[in-house]
């Protein structure tokens, strides 16, 4: 039973095919005699994705991560435009924050569609369809003349863009071994955070100012003088700037990516054999057992809801992961308040740069998870002593780092204190968010194994809904409480979450033994 831990390394945003992927890598023949059942010709079959050369696996992973960056980039790039667009459409800034929240809400609904599609049609078809429509929906955002068009387009680009977030982690599980896959997943995880962090930073060069009802070029001077941001584009370029590189890398993906989903590859092999031999009895397991609509609904909707009421591990981890993901999107509102309003930084370019502190923390967290996987997890995997709770030590460290970073950020926000300590506080915040997210999801996958898809669907549903809601109250909270106490409130909430990984590390095995869905170890 210990060998089953090989697969639980994906941090899939939707739980896409984590259950099926678990049985794919071995390449072994079935024991039952069926000479026309098409399977891999042993573990060394050259067509088995696990046998791709290292350069090919690395290239595919990099392309996947690039697609992910532009999807998540689109979720936050609009947040910096809330002030200007609120003036153009004559609504409050809080209303314009819906532009970000609706995209994240699309991330909530999308996996319920893209997960099942990847099981039926493979990785590439639904990925290409969703990603192409995601690109197309940048156009109505860029040319919208009314608020309704803008908001609907923002929702649908999130819905279709999440095809990448839902499908790619499962695809990585198709061709990476257990230890290497953890490293590949860490790269994908970093991409999911790099995108939204870069969004507000890249936006600053597209700002323009409304003067006497006419959009003009604007120079924003620092109060200290000397630094000028010459912004000649406009907020609509937040869509064009997303569309252009997303299209470029989408074309590269279309021309280079191979299908990796094992059941579909075997189905294609069976079809090829039927044509070559004229023996129509050749078939694959997918031909025998195509999931029914009812089975798909059970896996991605009904069972996840049931588990949210019955599984304490899933409930607690989902609450924790939802909190840290919500904090990330809340900061897209909080950072401009902290640096532009409180510190009176006039330049949007300068005010956006502190986001780089979170980015540095995300990359450091990615590195630490990789090191922990190599030095702690891999040896246990090799000697067969690994258990799900072995995922939690890095998460416990991150659970301590996150509140440290939050209190650090909040109580260095006074204009009388140098900006540097507050900007540096983003590093432990980024590390905490990345490591809690990665290891928390990995732990859920390890715990639930054969029903991991359902657990991840439940987590995704709640996590995305919470992260969509957080930006909506961020402005009011920070204006009412101030940066110090508003961020401290988040710090206190994160402190309240620290016992979750600690308790599961020591008592997780006993709790799992009482579960209806976790396999008995």
Swiss-Prot record:
Main location: membrane
Gene Ontology, cellular component aspect: plasma membrane
Glycosylation sites: 383
Pfam families found in the cross-reference section: MFS_1
Annotated Gene3D superfamilies: MFS general substrate transporter like domains (1.20.1250.20)
The entry's keywords: Glycoprotein, Membrane, Transmembrane, Transmembrane helix
Record carries keyword Membrane: yes
Membrane-topology descriptor: Multi-pass membrane protein
Transmembrane segments: 58-78, 95-115, 124-144, 155-175, 182-202, 237-257, 313-333, 349-369, 392-412, 417-437, 465-485, 489-509
UniProt-recorded Gene Ontology molecular function terms: transmembrane transporter activity
InterPro entries: MFS, MFS_dom, MFS_trans_sf
Region (Disordered): 1-29
Annotated CDD domains: MFS_Tpo1_MDR_like
Compartment(s) where it occurs, according to its Swiss-Prot or TrEMBL record: Membrane
Cysteines paired by S-S bonds: none
Function: MFS transporter; part of the gene cluster that mediates the biosynthesis the mycotoxin citrinin, a hepato-nephrotoxic compound to humans due to inhibition of respiration complex III.
Annotated family: Belongs to the major facilitator superfamily. CAR1 family.
Record's protein name: Citrinin biosynthesis cluster MFS transporter ctnC
Organism: Monascus purpureus
Designated gene of the protein: ctnC
């Amino acid at each position: 039973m210990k060998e089953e831990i090989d697969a639980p390394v994906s941090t899939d945003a939707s739980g896409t095919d984590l259950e099926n992927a678990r049985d794919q890598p071995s390449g072994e023949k079935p024991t039952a005699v069926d000479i026309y059942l098409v399977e891999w010709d042993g573990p060394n079959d050259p067509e088995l994705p696990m046998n791709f050369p290292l350069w090919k696996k690395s290239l595919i992973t990099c392309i996947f991560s690039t697609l992910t960056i532009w999807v998540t980039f689109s979720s936050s790039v609009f947040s910096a435009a809330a002030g200007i667009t609120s003036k153009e459409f004559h609504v409050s800034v809080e209303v314009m924050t819906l532009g970000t929240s609706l995209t994240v809400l699309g991330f909530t609904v999308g996996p319920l569609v893209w997960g099942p599609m990847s099981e039926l049609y493979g990785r590439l078809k639904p990925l290409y369809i969703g990603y192409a429509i995601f690109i197309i929906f940048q156009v109505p955002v860029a040319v919208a003349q009314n608020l309704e068009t803008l908001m609907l387009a923002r929702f649908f680009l999130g819905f279709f863009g999440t095809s990448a977030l839902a499908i790619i982690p499962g695809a990585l599980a198709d061709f990476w071994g257990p230890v290497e896959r953890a490293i590949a997943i860490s790269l994908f995880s970093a991409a999911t955070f790099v995108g939204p962090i870069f969004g507000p930073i890249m936006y600053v060069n597209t700002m323009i100012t409304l003067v006497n009802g006419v959009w003009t070029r604007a120079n924003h001077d620092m109060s200290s003088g000397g630094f000028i941001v010459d912004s000649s584009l406009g907020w609509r370029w937040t869509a064009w700037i997303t569309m252009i590189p997303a299209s470029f890398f989408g074309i590269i993906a279309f021309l280079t990516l191979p299908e990796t989903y094992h059941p579909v590859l075997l189905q294609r092999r069976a079809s090829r054999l039927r044509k070559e031999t004229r023996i129509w009895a050749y078939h694959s397991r997918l031909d025998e057992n195509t999931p029914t609509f009812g089975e798909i609904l059970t896996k991605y909707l009904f069972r996840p809801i049931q588990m949210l009421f019955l599984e304490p591990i899933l409930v607690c981890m989902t609450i924790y992961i939802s909190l840290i993901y919500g904090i990330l999107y809340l900061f897209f509102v909080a950072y401009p308040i902290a640096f532009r309003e409180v510190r009176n930084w006039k330049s949007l370019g300068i005010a956006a740069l502190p986001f780089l502190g979170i980015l540095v923390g995300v990359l450091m967290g990615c590195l630490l998870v990789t090191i922990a996987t190599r030095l702690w997890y891999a040896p246990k995997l090799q000697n067969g002593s690994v258990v799900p709770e072995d995922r939690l030590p890095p998460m416990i460290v991150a659970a301590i780092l996150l509140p440290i970073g939050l209190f650090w950020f909040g109580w260095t926000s006074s204009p009388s204190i140098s900006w540097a300590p507050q900007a540096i506080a983003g590093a432990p915040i980024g590390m905490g968010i990345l490591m809690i997210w990665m290891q928390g999801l990995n732990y859920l996958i390890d715990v639930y194994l054969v029903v991991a898809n359902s657990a991840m669907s439940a987590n995704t549903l709640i996590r995305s809904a919470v992260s969509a809601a957080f930006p909506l109250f961020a402005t009011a909270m920070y204006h009412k409480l101030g940066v110090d106490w508003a961020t401290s409130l988040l710090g206190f909430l994160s402190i309240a979450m620290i016992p979750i990984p600690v308790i599961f590390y020591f008592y997780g095995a006993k709790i799992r033994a009482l579960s209806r869905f976790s396999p008995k170890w």
